[in-house]
C-alpha cells in the first residue's frame, strides 16, 4: 500500500494484550497541491519530534526503561522463542503504545510477564554502548534503578491517582511534580492567581514543579530549559514548515508558537492560541504543544501532543451547519439564563482528516477536539472544533460485524435502530460535544476556572456530553438536514446508556474502580439517569444476561436536560462540594457482580477493548535537480518497525 490508492485498504493490523492496532487512510491527500503536501510533511516531522517528551512526562523512568527494552529486543541472542522473551516483546509493545509503563487509559502499572532473573540476564548480555547508561554508570547501577520500578507492584503503582481523600500528587507517578505535596502545589499556584485578572494565564501548564534545597521551583519546558533538545528539533521543523504555509496568518501562528517554545511565557501561549483560533483559511492545520491536562491529577500540567490535519470539505458541511447556529443552540439550552453566553463568539467546526499523530495523540487518539481550553479566550475569541473523520472511519470499518452489538443490545429492533442510525448519530454527538458543548455556558464573575480541582475534567466532559445528548434529539437537526428523521436520536440514546451502564466496564479490571475522566463522565450521566428516571430506563435480565431497556425515549431527553442544568450550575459557580458528591456517588464504583458478567460476555467475543493507530510513513520523491516532486504515503510499515524507527529518528532526550 505504497500509493494513495484507496482500493482494498486494510484498516486492521496486529493485536496484542488488550490492544488492536488500526490504520487510518488520508482520504483526499492526493488532491492537495504539492506545496500543501510538503507543508504537511514538515509539520508531521515536528509532530514526531515531541515523542520523547510525552514518554518522560508520563513517568521519570519511562525513557530509560524503553531504551533498555529496545536494546534487548534488538540485540538479545539467547532463545527468542522462550516465554520470557515473548512476554518482554508484548511488554515493550505496550510501553510503546502507552508512552511508558502505565496503561494509557486505566493508568495502572503493567505487570511484566517475564521474570526478574530473565531481565537481569538479558541486560547483562547487552553491550554497554546499547544501554542508556549515564557517565560512570554500570549495568548493575542501571538494574538497581529499573528493576524495582518494573517489578515491585508497591513502587509507583499508578500514573494518575484520583482516589478521594489521599494526596493525589504524592500517589501519582506522572513526572509533573517532584518532592512536593498536593497541598504545597495548590498553595504555590493559588499565590500566583489574581482574582481580578479577567485574562488569567494557564498557571502551571508548561512546567514541572519540584523542590530544590527546600525551595519550590518551576522547571519550565522551553528551548533553553527542560526538554530543550526536543523542543529545538520541533521548532526547527516548524521553521521549515513555515516556508510552505498557505497564507500569512498560518505563518504568523507558527511565529507565535516558536516564540512561546523559546520563552516558555504563558502569555505568549495565550497570544498564540488567539491567533490559532482566528486562523481559518487554508486546508491544513495542526496542534503542537503542551495542551491537555488529563495526565495531571490536579488538572494543571499539559501533556505534549501533536496532530497534523487537513479539511474534509464534504463532511465539513455538517459541522458548519451546527456552528452557524451556535447562538440558537445556546439560547435554547435548558440551563439557567445567568449561566448562558449572551453572545456566542467565533465557534468554528470542521471535519478533518488526520495526517499524522504524535505525543499524547499517538497511537491512541481522540476523535474530536475543541480548543483552546482557556475559558476567557473561548468567551472573547471563540474556539476551534474538529471531528477527525478518517479515524472514525477506521473505527467503524474495524467494528463492522464483530458481534459486539449482537451481544449487548436488548433486541433485534434496537439492533436495527443502531445499525440504521448509529454511525450518523455518533458523528453528530461528537460534533455537538466538541463544537457546542465545550464552547457553551459561562463562569460567573470571580469564579476560579480550577475551582473543581480533581473533578474538573469529569464535570467538563459530562457538560459537553449532556449538551450533545440533549440536542441530538432536537427537531432542529432534522430541519438542518443533519438527522434523517425524528427517530434517529434513539440510536444514540441507547448506545450511550448501554456504554455508560454496561459495556465501558470491559475496559476495567475486576475489582478496580473507574478512573479516566471520559469514562467517569459517561458513568455519572448513565447512573444518575437510571436512578432519577427509572420509569424511562431500566436494567433488566433476559436469559440470565443484563441489558439496558428503554421504555420512554422522550423522557430521557428531559433527564439529560435536568442533569445538564445542574452540571452547568456546578461549573459556573465553581461548586466543588456538589461536584465531588456527584462524581463519587455515580462515576467511580462498579457493581462487582454486573462487572463480572460483562467481562465474561465480552471475553467470549474475542475482541480487544482498546484501539490505536499506526501512522502512515511519509516519504519524499525528488527529481534529478533535487527538488521534491511528490510526498508518498506508505501504509505498510509494521507497528514494531515504526516504533523502533521513531526511537531512532526522533529520539531527542
What are these regions (language model features)?
Residues 4-74:
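N-terminal-proximal low-complexity accessory segments that begin disordered
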Residues 25, 54, 469-570:
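Long, well-structured alpha-helical subdomains associated
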Residues 33, 247, 457-474:
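An active-site-proximal "capping" alpha-helix that borders the catalytic cofactor pocket
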Residues 98, 104-416, 422:
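Contiguous, non-catalytic segments that form substrate-binding/exosite surfaces or channel walls
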Residues 248-254, 269, 447-450, 477-495, ...:
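Short, glycine/acidic-rich hinge or "gate" loops at secondary-structure transitions
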Residues 423-436:
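Short alpha-helix carrying the canonical HExxH Zn2+-binding catalytic motif
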Residues 441-462:
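Post-HEXXH active-site segment of zinc metalloproteases
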Residues 552, 556-653:
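Extended, compositionally biased alpha-helical segments that mediate assembly or anchoring
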Amino acid at each position: 500500500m505504497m500509493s494513495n490508492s484507496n482500493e482494498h485498504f486494510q484498516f486492521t493490523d496486529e493485536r496484542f494484550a488488550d490492544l488492536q492496532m488500526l490504520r487510518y487512510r488520508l482520504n483526499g491527500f492526493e488532491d492537495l497541491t504539492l506545496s500543501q503536501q510538503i507543508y504537511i510533511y514538515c509539520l508531521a516531522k515536528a509532530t514526531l519530534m515531541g515523542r520523547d517528551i510525552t514518554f518522560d512526562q508520563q513517568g521519570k523512568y519511562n525513557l530509560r526503561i524503553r531504551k533498555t527494552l529496545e536494546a534487548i529486543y534488538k540485540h538479545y541472542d539467547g532463545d527468542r522463542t522462550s516465554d520470557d522473551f515473548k512476554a518482554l516483546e508484548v511488554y515493550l509493545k505496550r510501553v510503546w503504545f502507552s508512552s511508558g509503563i502505565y496503561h494509557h487509559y486505566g493508568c495502572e502499572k503493567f505487570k511484566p510477564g517475564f521474570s526478574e532473573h530473565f531481565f537481569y540476564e538479558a541486560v547483562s548480555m547487552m553491550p554497554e554502548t546499547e544501554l542508556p547508561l549515564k557517565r560512570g554508570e554500570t549495568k548493575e547501577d542501571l538494574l538497581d534503578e529499573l528493576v524495582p520500578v518494573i517489578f515491585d507492584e508497591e513502587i509507583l503503582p499508578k500514573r494518575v491517582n484520583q482516589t478521594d481523600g489521599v494526596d493525589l500528587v504524592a500517589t501519582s507517578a506522572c513526572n509533573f511534580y517532584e518532592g512536593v505535596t498536593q497541598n504545597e502545589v495548590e498553595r504555590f499556584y493559588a499565590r500566583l492567581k489574581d482574582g481580578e485578572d479577567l485574562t488569567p494565564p494557564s498557571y502551571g501548564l508548561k512546567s514541572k514543579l519540584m523542590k530544590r534545597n527546600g525551595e519550590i521551583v518551576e522547571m519550565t519546558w522551553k528551548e533553553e530549559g527542560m526538554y530543550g533538545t526536543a523542543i529545538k528539533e520541533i521548532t526547527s521543523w516548524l521553521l521549515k514548515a513555515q516556508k510552505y504555509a498557505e497564507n500569512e496568518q498560518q505563518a504568523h501562528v507558527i511565529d507565535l508558537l516558536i516564540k512561546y517554545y523559546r520563552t516558555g511565557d504563558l502569555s505568549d501561549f495565550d497570544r498564540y492560541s488567539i491567533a490559532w483560533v482566528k486562523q481559518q483559511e487554508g486546508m491544513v492545520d495542526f496542534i503542537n504543544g503542551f495542551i491537555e491536562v488529563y495526565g495531571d491529577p490536579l488538572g494543571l500540567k499539559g501533556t505534549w501532543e501533536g496532530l497534523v490535519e487537513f479539511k474534509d470539505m464534504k463532511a465539513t458541511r455538517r459541522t458548519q451547519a451546527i456552528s452557524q447556529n451556535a447562538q440558537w443552540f445556546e439560547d435554547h439550552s435548558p440551563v439557567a439564563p445567568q449561566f448562558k453566553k449572551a453572545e456566542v463568539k467565533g465557534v468554528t467546526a470542521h471535519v478533518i482528516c488526520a495526517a499524522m499523530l504524535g505525543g499524547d495523540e499517538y497511537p491512541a487518539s481522540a476523535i474530536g477536539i475543541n480548543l483552546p481550553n482557556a475559558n476567557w479566550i473561548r468567551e472573547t475569541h471563540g474556539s476551534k472544533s474538529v471531528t477527525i473523520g478518517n479515524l472514525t472511519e477506521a473505527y467503524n470499518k474495524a467494528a463492522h460485524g464483530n458481534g459486539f452489538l449482537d451481544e449487548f443490545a436488548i433486541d433485534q429492533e434496537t439492533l436495527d435502530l443502531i445499525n440504521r442510525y448509529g454511525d450518523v448519530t455518533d458523528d453528530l454527538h461528537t460534533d455537538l460535544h466538541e463544537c457546542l458543548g465545550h464552547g457553551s455556558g459561562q463562569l460567573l464573575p470571580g469564579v476560579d476556572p480550577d475551582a473543581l480541582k480533581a473533578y474538573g475534567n469529569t464535570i467538563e466532559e459530562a457538560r459537553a456530553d449532556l449538551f450533545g445528548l440533549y440536542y441530538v434529539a432536537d427537531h432542529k437537526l432534522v430541519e438542518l438536514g443533519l438527522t434523517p428523521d425524528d427517530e434517529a436520536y434513539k440510536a444514540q440514546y441507547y448506545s450511550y446508556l448501554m456504554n455508560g451502564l454496561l459495556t465501558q466496564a470491559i475496559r476495567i479490571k475486576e475489582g478496580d474502580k473507574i478512573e479516566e475522566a471520559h469514562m467517569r463522565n459517561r458513568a455519572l450521566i448513565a447512573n444518575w439517569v437510571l436512578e432519577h428516571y427509572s420509569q424511562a430506563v431500566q436494567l433488566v435480565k433476559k436469559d440470565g444476561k443484563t441489558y439496558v431497556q428503554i421504555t420512554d425515549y422522550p423522557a430521557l431527553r428531559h433527564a439529560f436536560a435536568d442533569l445538564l442544568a445542574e452540571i452547568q450550575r456546578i461549573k459556573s459557580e465553581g461548586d466543588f462540594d456538589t461536584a465531588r458528591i456527584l462524581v463519587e456517588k455515580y462515576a467511580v464504583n462498579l457493581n462487582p457482580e454486573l462487572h463480572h458478567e460483562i467481562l465474561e460476555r465480552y471475553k467470549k467475543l474475542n475482541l480487544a477493548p482498546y484501539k490505536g493507530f499506526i501512522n502512515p510513513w511519509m516519504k519524499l520523491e525528488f527529481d534529478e535537480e533535487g527538488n521534491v516532486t511528490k510526498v508518498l504515503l506508505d501504509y505498510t510499515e509494521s507497528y514494531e518497525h515504526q516504533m523502533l524507527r521513531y526511537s531512532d529518528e526522533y529520539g531527542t532526550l
